[in-house]
Curated annotation (Swiss-Prot):
Belongs to the nucleoporin Nup85 family. This is Nuclear pore complex protein Nup75. One of its GO terms (cellular component) is nuclear membrane. It comes from Drosophila melanogaster. Component of the nuclear pore complex (NPC). Component of the NPC Nup107-160 subcomplex. GO terms for biological process: mRNA export from nucleus; positive regulation of DNA-templated transcription; protein import into nucleus. The keyword Plastid does not apply. Component of the nuclear pore complex (NPC) that seems to be required for NPC assembly and maintenance. Required for nuclear import of phosphorylated Mad via importin msk. Has no role in classical nuclear localization signal (cNLS)-dependent nuclear import via importin-beta. Facilitates the interaction between Nup93 and sec13 with msk. It holds the Pfam family Nucleopor_Nup85. It is found in: Nucleus, Nuclear pore complex; Nucleus membrane. InterPro entries: Nucleoporin_Nup85.
């Protein structure tokens, strides 16, 4: 893993080139930047159009950061890590060390599974033919390999906190340097012929330097010369090497190990292996010979590759505080022997862990190209297990604040991705007030792909008491349904948004459409509005007019007449609907059997003169002879004057009939 550099770029269009390739940018929702050409202006610049004004188009470029998680194969990492993160929050700070170790291993298991998927995906034909995607997968493998390697080492040194670390370090080194073990498997399958391979001894030496004693013995036992004295002696040395077991007395183990080490040195000095130079070099490695280990260091790729093996043969009971000194010496030795190799960030971070420099380690961990996946989850685990609290206190590091900041940033990143926003909410929920504020800002910006998703968002907002978010989503859905000509849905979502202006606008559209065409839109939705009509006065009018419409359609003229008069008296009739409402009264007024009484008929005449006539006069003065197009938009109207005369005449006739009937005494 190498350090990444800073890349420079330019827009390259005509305007940008003329402006000297200077740019300006504005952040827009979705972690994007809108870039365009820019010419620097100072206090002495003249306030006039530039020479390029109007000559070339102004192009705006939307720049968005690409991340590893844009690759579908990697999204499972986010979901699985989210589940482990939630489990850790439930455990809190009262869990046992074993439970924290299990959580750590769960995170590492997720990464290892991801690496396997990446390796499989990389070998697929469609990826092999797509260079860009192949490069993305290779980059992801490098990043997650580094994350697993560093997490594993951190777990050994700081979460398990064993007194003796060499056995765990050996497992760590073997897993992250599998080449020698893979080749050893090939040699074992070859049998005696393996000893004729050109890389036979280099593989065996690598196995020893990795501490693979049992595998080395198995490979040597198949050598054609395995029956010779020197090979038997080597087998005995490897077999009899003391290995520390937990609970064993340290002093007794040291005595046994010293005896074994001195005996091995004596056999080397006696020339027992002189006839087999390669085997002698191997045994010298086992004895910790500096010259042989220096030769091995020169062949290593990373400084930490053979360090655990060296400790196994020179300091098998190394404790964590001793590892700091041993690792520093080993790194200096490696740098002297490999001066041509620059120390990459991976080597540096391993060194920081072994040197107990967690401040720098956390700083470098945030530079991994994984959108802070590694550093966020690791810091959260550190915070909960509490074993490093004294270290952070001594170094004046506010661990809770650091954790809060990392989780907040990571959760905000997930919230800006249309595929991962639901995971981001779980992280922001851990950030208390700031997290709630972020959710309130980011939830309405999520691209709504379906009403099902919108319902899920609304439920999430409702659970957190984010009423404004719920209403904002409803407004978006209402406007989208309106644009798609789904007016029933538009009205339903508008009512749920409780936005008076939006409800009024949708109701206005339905009323205007009816007055123009005579067709009532979304009758089922209007019929089921019920008590929600009070969201807007216009919706109240629409609901009540729809009731009148239904009474009229079912020929319940008395109820229709009563409701019509109530609407006229309600003072909530919109100006544009007065003509339609009054025209609706004409069939009722012309009925031979009066449906509207004298008092109500006078009221209708009053509304004609005090409400409709002023509207007509106002529009005549404003639009002249075209006023008919602005006031009388009812589909039943052709001539204004004729309709006005018919309305007055219908009122006069109905008034006469009503007065006669109302003032005639019944015959006894």
């Amino acid at each position: 893993m190498s350090d990444s550099g800073v890349f420079a770029f330019e827009l390259g269009d005509d305007l940008a080139t003329r402006c000297g390739n200077t740019l300006t940018g504005v952040f827009v929702p979705g972690s994007r930047i809108a870039l365009s050409a820019y010419r620097h202006v100072t206090h002495s610049s003249r306030d006039e159009p530039t020479e390029n004004a109007g000559q070339v188009p102004v192009l705006i470029y939307m720049a968005q950061e690409s991340t590893l998680f844009d690759e579908p194969v990697l999204r499972s990492v986010l979901a699985e890590a989210n589940a482990t993160f939630a489990t850790l929050q439930q455990l809190g700070s009262r869990a046992t060390r074993a439970e924290y170790v299990n959580i750590s291993r769960a995170y590492r298991s997720i990464v290892r599974s991801c690496l396997e998927k990446l390796e499989q995906a990389k070998k697929s034909p469609e990826v092999q033919t797509d260079e860009a995607r192949l490069q993305r997968l290779c980059d992801a493998i490098v990043v997650f390999y580094a994350a697993e390697c560093l997490w594993h080492l951190f777990e050994i040194l700081y979460i398990q906190s064993n007194q003796l670390v060499v056995p765990q370090l050996l497992d760590w080194a073997r897993f992250h340097s599998p080449h020698a073990e893979d080749r050893a498997t090939d040699l074992l399958l070859m049998g005696e012929e393996a000893s004729e391979s050109d890389d036979y001894w280099s593989i065996v030496k690598s196995l020893i330097m990795l501490g693979e004693i049992d595998v080395t013995r198995a490979v040597l036992s198949q050598n054609r010369k395995a029956g010779q004295t020197s090979f038997k002696a080597a087998e005995q040395i490897l077999k009899s090497m003391p290995v520390y077991q937990e609970g064993y007395a340290l002093q007794k183990f040291h005595s046994q190990w010293e005896f074994w080490h001195v005996d091995t040195e004596r056999k080397i000095q006696s020339g027992l292996f002189a006839t087999e130079p390669e085997l002698e070099q191997l045994i010298r490695l086992v004895a910790g010979d500096s010259e042989q280990w220096d030769a091995g260091i020169k062949e290593s790729q990373d400084f930490y590759e053979y360090l655990p093996g060296y400790l196994l043969f020179t300091k098998p009971t190394c404790k964590p505080f001793e590892l700091k000194i041993a690792a520093a010496k080993w790194l200096n030795r490696w740098c002297l022997l490999r001066p041509e190799r620059e120390q990459c960030s991976m080597n540096r971070m391993v060194s920081q862990l072994m040197d107990h420099d967690l401040r720098l380690f956390i700083y470098d961990a945030q530079k991994l190209n994984d959108t802070h996946w590694f550093s966020t989850h690791l810091i959260d685990l550190i915070h909960h297990c509490g074993q490093l609290k004294s270290y952070f206190d001594q170094n004046n590091i506010d661990l809770p604040a650091l954790r809060h900041s990392m989780i907040y940033e990571y959760g905000s990143y997930l919230m800006t991705s249309h595929n991962m926003w639901q995971l981001g909410i779980d992280y922001l929920d851990c950030c208390k007030q700031e997290g709630q504020a972020a959710i309130e800002l980011l939830l309405p910006r999520i691209t709504l792909r379906s009403e099902r998703q919108a319902t899920k968002l609304i439920n999430l907002a409702r659970q957190r008491g984010l009423i404004s978010v719920e209403r904002e989503i409803c407004k978006v859905l209402s406007k989208r349904s309106y644009d798609n000509e789904r007016y029933g849905n538009a009205l339903e979502w508008a009512i749920r948004s409780k936005d008076v202006l939006l409800v009024t606008a949708v109701a206005d559209f339905i009323l205007k459409h009816y007055s123009k065409t005579g067709c009532m839109l979304c009758p089922d939705t209007i019929a089921n509005v019920g008590g929600r009509m009070f969201a807007s006065p216009r919706l109240v009018f629409l609901s009540k007019y729809f009731e009148f419409y239904e009474f009229y359609r079912t020929r319940d003229f008395l109820s229709a007449s009563e409701l019509l008069v109530n609407l006229l008296e309600s003072k909530i009739t919109p100006d544009y609907f007065w003509p339609s409402l009054l025209i609706d009264s004409m069939p009722l007024l012309e009925s031979k059997d009066p449906k509207i009484f004298a008092k109500e008929t006078v009221a209708i005449l009053h509304h004609i003169e005090t409400d409709l006539v002023p509207i007509i006069e106002r529009d005549v003065s404003k639009y002249g002879k075209h006023h008919t197009e602005t006031v009388f938009k009812d589909y039943r109207v052709e001539n204004v004057d004729e309709i006005m005369n018919l309305l007055r005449l219908a009122c006069a006739r109905n008034l006469a009939r009503a007065l006669i009937i109302e003032n005639t005494l019944p015959v006894v």
